């Protein structure tokens, strides 16, 4: 489910109003793939990337890989795309797999592209750039455990009071 709909007015005048066409989802999803070992994959969509608690919840419930299929614009993509994905990888200690639309669309919109695969340490392992192509890399799930042991932010998180 895409939980957060993209209803924004960007500084360049672009307006996106997904709520006019779509309804939001209400459930965070983790799929389990049965292989030699179980692999847990958290699923998010596009604008969800801007809500770190969703990613932390997925990781807290066992996600080792989180997918983020997206269509970032040429306005937000160059300054936000890599940064947000790397931050979510680092915060959660998960691999991030982010397929992204690229190029010009019939409706006149342009998408930034840059399908990415990012390690739990925040390293970009594969980047498609603006190309229409297939990217891949070897994912060693042992890296998830290593990253989470090195920086145990998921276990260190504390609830706190506010004075506002």
Regions found by a protein language model. Give the residues of each.
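Active-site catalytic loop in hydrolytic enzyme cores
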Residues: 1-61, 74-83, 150-153
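Short, well-ordered beta-strand micro-motif
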Residues: 30-32, 117, 136-138
């Amino acid at each position: 489910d895409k939980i957060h709909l993209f209803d924004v007015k960007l500084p360049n005048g672009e307006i996106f109003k997904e709520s006019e066409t779509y309804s939001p989802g209400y459930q965070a999803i983790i799929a389990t793939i049965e292989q030699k070992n179980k692999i847990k994959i958290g699923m998010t969509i596009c604008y969800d990337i801007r809500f770190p608690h969703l990613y932390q919840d997925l990781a807290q419930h066992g996600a080792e890989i989180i997918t983020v299929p997206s269509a970032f614009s040429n306005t937000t993509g160059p300054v936000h795309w890599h940064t947000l994905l790397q931050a979510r990888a680092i915060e959660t200690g998960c691999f991030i797999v982010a397929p992204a639309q690229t190029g010009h669309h019939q409706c006149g919109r342009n998408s930034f592209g840059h399908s990415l695969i990012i390690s739990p340490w925040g390293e970009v392992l594969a980047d498609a750039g603006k190309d229409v192509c297939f990217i891949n890399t070897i994912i060693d799930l042992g890296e998830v455990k290593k990253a989470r042991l090195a920086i145990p932010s998921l276990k260190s998180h504390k609830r706190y009071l506010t004075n506002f």
